[in-house]
Regions:
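Short, structured coil segments at secondary-structure junctions
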Residues: 29-30, 82-83, 107-108, 135-137
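Canonical P-loop GTPase G-domain recognition
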Residues: 111, 118-174
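Short, glycine/polar-rich helix-capping loops at beta-to-alpha or helix-loop-helix junctions
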Residues: 19-23, 97-103, 124-131
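Short, surface-exposed amphipathic charged segments that create phosphate/polyanion-binding patches used
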Residues: 47-53, 153-163, 183-188
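Nucleotide-state-sensitive switch-loop elements of NTP-binding domains
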Residues: 1-81, 95, 117, 150
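P-loop NTP-binding site
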Residues: 2-7, 166-206
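Conserved beta-strand segments of the P-loop GTPase G domain that flank and frequently precede/overlap
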Residues: 14, 36, 87-92, 113-116, ...
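Inter-motif core of Ras-like GTPase G domains
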Residues: 72-94, 100-110
Length: 206
């Protein structure tokens, strides 16, 4: 995709959980990248509290296109920003019903990039795309092959449609981050009702 944006000076900021080898891969591709690790924090809370600094860093370094990538581990979360193009990457090998299990990260995306289509049948690809449409009928679905690069040019052209902004301050997420701040979020490891502090949700069993 980067090759399809020759007129732009691009930077990438990756918000990950514990470890990542992406920085080296970006470097090998000639792309400046910074990786941040959420550690024990919620990855999407980590994203929200650092994305303005990431924007300021890229702007200060003279980049004219910033791509931010989150770990994407929590299907409930959606760190998509209103007014900024949002991309959800999902692969065919995750199962044909997976799109129906995803939350705002897929439902509120502008573009859905589907990978690994070369290792499943045409019927599976079509069912997978159909299930994406059920969740997000307005999204632009792109089939991209990460090995051959097929579809990457169209993705690059999509990225060029983004509008220019001077700051992210004051902008809003498209959906709320999880509100469950509980004792386990802050380091508790013991099991038992007496340790269930903060916001919790109990299941009902017959």
């Amino acid at each position: 995709m980067i090759d399809g944006l020759p007129k732009h000076k691009i930077a990438v900021v990756k918000f990950d959980c514990l470890t990542s080898s992406d920085q080296e891969q970006y470097r090998n591709a000639g792309v400046t990248a910074v990786i941040g690790y959420a550690g024990k924090l919620c990855p999407d809370h980590f994203f929200v509290t650092n994305v303005q600094d990431a924007f300021d860093w890229a702007k200060g370094k003279g980049f004219d296109l910033l791509i931010t990538e989150s770990a994407g581990l929590c299907n409930r979360c959606s760190p998509h920003i209103q007014g900024i193009p949002a991309v959800c990457v999902i692969d065919n090998l995750s199962g044909i019903n997976t799109p129906r299990k995803l939350g705002p990260v897929l439902r509120l995306a502008d573009t859905v990039v589907v990978t690994k289509g070369d290792v499943v049948s045409q019927a599976e690809r079509e069912i997978f795309a159909y299930n994406i449409r059920l969740v997000n009928p307005r999204a632009n679905i792109l089939q991209v092959n990460g090995i051959t690069g097929q579809g990457a040019f169209l993705l690059a052209k999509n990225m060029e449609k983004t509008r220019s902004v001077d700051t992210l301050s004051g902008m809003q997420l498209r959906f709320t981050t999880p509100s469950s701040v509980c004792a386990y979020c802050t380091g508790e490891r013991r099991i038992g009702m007496e340790y269930h502090l903060g916001m919790n949700k109990a299941m009902e069993f017959e």
